[in-house]
Curated annotation (Swiss-Prot):
One of its GO terms (cellular component) is extracellular region. This is Tryptophyllin-5.1. Its main location: secreted. It comes from the Eukaryota. It is found in: Secreted.
Length: 5
């Protein structure tokens, strides 16, 4: 998943 989530 994207790291900002």
């Amino acid at each position: 998943f994207p790291p900002w989530l």
